[in-house]
Regions:
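Terminal ABC-like ATPase head and other globular end-domains that cap long coiled-coil arms
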Residues: 1-157
């Protein structure tokens, strides 16, 4: 999944064991020896040095989390997903990749996404606007053009 979102990169899940940690002498292969999973990625090259999640920017961490979520969904799918501003910290190229991924995955599940970015709107097929007036929120179906117009007004100049 990571390579679909970042074609030039590579992502891996790395199983962490006690004997991988400093000062550990346990070479046991039992379940108790496994202590977690780490994420290791490269955004620039398949041969580039891998970085740990702690070294990444907020947007890169978000992209890694989304790749992991999408991979888990492939193994254990649900019929419905609600994602709130999942693209907020992503660069435009990654917002487009995530929108395309959701469009592809939506063939087998329903996705409801909130966004203030045009890339997600381009891939969607139904749009709703939320209006807050007189201390009351209301929702109405809107056109793609209205949705794009709204998010473009919200973008910093």
């Amino acid at each position: 999944m990571f390579e679909k979102l970042v074609p030039a990169g590579q992502g891996r899940l790395v199983i962490q064991r006690k004997h991988d940690l400093p000062n550990s002498e346990d070479n046991n292969t039992s379940v108790e020896n496994y202590v977690g999973v780490a994420i290791s990625v490269s955004f620039n090259s398949k041969n580039d040095e891998q970085q740990r999640i702690q070294q990444l920017s907020g947007g890169q961490k978000s992209l890694c989390a989304l790749a992991l979520i999408f991979a888990i969904q492939q193994c254990d799918p649900a019929p419905f997903y609600c994602l709130d501003e999942l693209d907020a910290n992503l660069d435009a190229q990654y917002r487009t990749a995530v929108a395309s991924m959701i469009e592809e995955l939506s063939e087998n599940a329903q996705y409801i996404c909130t966004t203030f970015r045009p890339e997600m709107i381009q891939a969607a097929d139904k749009f709703f606007g939320v209006i807050f007036q007189n201390k009351v929120s209301s929702i109405q179906e809107i056109t793609k053009e209205n949705a794009l117009e709204f998010v473009e007004q919200e973008q910093p100049q």
